[in-house]
């Protein structure tokens, strides 16, 4: 029954794609590749695969909605397993109730999470649970943790990676102890942070790197931050990256969106929406870059850029939740706890704020002058006005009674 259901769902989801030769989108073939993991087969699975992808889930309840949600997750995993079948990656499920002892041994704590075991490392996937995102994430994981840059064209390719944190080191050769320390450090952050290395003196000269020196490139910055006190141990590199891995301006990416969202500052995010492919969005992004470059030394500033094109399924949700129009650039403050938000007034796409105006607005945010409680205070004020209005009504009634009494007295005098 399971196989028939998954086959039908797979066909329904993917059969709308064209079937021309060379563009055959994968459809689920009905073969079960995702298995249940237990204490008995763990050792065998680890020995068999280079990577082991584990979905840690709560027990499947009897209600239909929960069952369908679980089955949709299952078909995503089955499709990914099918696409990557030739890559020696195993896919398993771990029931939190049936395999509680195993989950504790593996260090799993959050139900609904996806983990990847690679050697002695456990990597948690904190991105969108979608087949294409998962495939890209796993392909990045099976690559070498360090990519070598050998010539000018590869330098150009490296320099065009502007929206990700990256490191590049210059070493004597692959046998260098300092290069090996660099490799070990890279494994701690793969695939979320890119590590590059060169053994070419001309490349190093172009990038202004000395022997055994490593440049740390923050997203959207023109110049790298050269890590001090070379040469470095693995521990020193890891410590430096962890200390500096929250950039001034970063992009929300499907592969690590939840981890990024949880990395807030004092419970808030400064969020900017801008479509890079749209002229106004591109212009606004360039203004954001300038602000980030001018304020890169401010540890309290971190702007989260979201390109709506990266998250088409979330656009309607964001517009409803934040009460904004995502067809034009937006920047605001979002409380990560309750999604309360307040947004900068941008009256017209043709009248985007300047870098100076944006900096002034951000300064007000960081000082607390602009905050997500403003709307709540306004609501309270409105309530206060209502109470005042009620009091006024009472006063009016009292005055009316007094007028009536005066009128009665006048009538008595007439009599």
Swiss-Prot record:
Record text on subunit structure and interactions: Monomer, homodimer and homooligomer. Mostly monomeric in the absence of calcium. Forms higher oligomers in a calcium-dependent manner. Dimers associate to form tetramers, that then form linear homomer chains. Interacts with ASPH and TRDN.
CC annotations in GO: junctional membrane complex; sarcoplasmic reticulum; sarcoplasmic reticulum lumen; Z disc
Main location: other
Species of provenance: Mus musculus (Mouse)
Phosphotyrosine: residues bearing it: 282
Signal sequence interval, chain numbering: 1-19
Mod. after translation: Phosphorylation in the C-terminus moderately increases calcium buffering capacity. N-glycosylated.
Protein name per UniProt: Calsequestrin-2
GO molecular function: calcium ion binding; calcium ion sequestering activity
Function: Calsequestrin is a high-capacity, moderate affinity, calcium-binding protein and thus acts as an internal calcium store in muscle. Calcium ions are bound by clusters of acidic residues at the protein surface, especially at the interface between subunits. Can bind around 60 Ca(2+) ions. Regulates the release of lumenal Ca(2+) via the calcium release channel RYR2; this plays an important role in triggering muscle contraction. Plays a role in excitation-contraction coupling in the heart and in regulating the rate of heart beats.
């Amino acid at each position: 029954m399971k196989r028939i259901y998954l086959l039908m769902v797979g066909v329904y989801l993917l059969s709308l794609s064209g079937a021309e030769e060379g563009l055959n989108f994968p459809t689920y073939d009905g073969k079960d590749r995702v298995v249940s993991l237990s204490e008995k087969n763990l050792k065998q699975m680890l020995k068999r695969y280079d990577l082991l992808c584990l979905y840690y889930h709560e027990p499947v309840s009897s209600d239909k909605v929960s069952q369908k949600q679980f089955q949709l997750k299952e078909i995503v995993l089955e499709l990914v397993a099918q696409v990557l079948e030739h890559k020696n990656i195993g896919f398993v499920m771990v029931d939190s109730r049936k395999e509680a002892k195993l989950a504790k041994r593996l260090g799993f704590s959050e139900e609904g999470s996806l983990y990847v075991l690679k050697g002695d490392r456990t990597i948690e996937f904190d991105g969108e649970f979608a087949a294409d995102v998962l495939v890209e994430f796993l392909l990045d994981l099976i690559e070498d943790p360090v990519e070598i840059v050998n010539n000018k064209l590869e330098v150009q390719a490296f320099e065009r990676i502007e929206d990700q944190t990256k490191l590049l080191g210059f070493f004597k050769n692959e046998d260098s102890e300092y290069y090996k320390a660099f490799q070990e450090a890279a494994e701690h952050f793969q695939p979320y942070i890119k590590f590059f290395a060169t053994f070419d003196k001309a490349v190093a000269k172009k990038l202004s790197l000395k022997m055994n020196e490593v440049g740390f490139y923050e997203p959207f910055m023109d110049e790298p931050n050269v890590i001090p006190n070379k040469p470095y141990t693995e521990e020193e590199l890891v410590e430096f990256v962890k200390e500096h891995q929250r950039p001034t301006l970063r992009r929300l990416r499907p592969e690590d969106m939840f981890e990024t969202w949880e990395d807030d500052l004092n419970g808030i995010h400064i969020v900017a929406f801008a479509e890079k492919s749209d002229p106004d969005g591109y212009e606004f992004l360039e203004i954001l870059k300038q602000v980030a470059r001018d304020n890169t030394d401010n540890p309290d500033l971190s702007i989260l850029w979201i390109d709506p094109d990266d998250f088409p399924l979330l656009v309607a949700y964001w517009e409803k939740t934040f009460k904004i129009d995502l067809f034009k650039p937006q920047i605001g403050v979002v409380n990560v706890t309750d999604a309360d938000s307040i947004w900068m007034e941008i009256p017209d796409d043709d009248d985007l704020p300047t870098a100076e105006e944006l900096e002034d607005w951000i300064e007000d945010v960081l000082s607390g002058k602009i905050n997500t409680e403003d709307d709540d205070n306004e609501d309270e004020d409105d309530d206060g006005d209502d109470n005042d209005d009620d009091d006024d009504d009472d006063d009016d009634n009292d005055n009316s009674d007094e007028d009536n009494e005066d009128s009665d007295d006048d009538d008595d005098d007439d009599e």
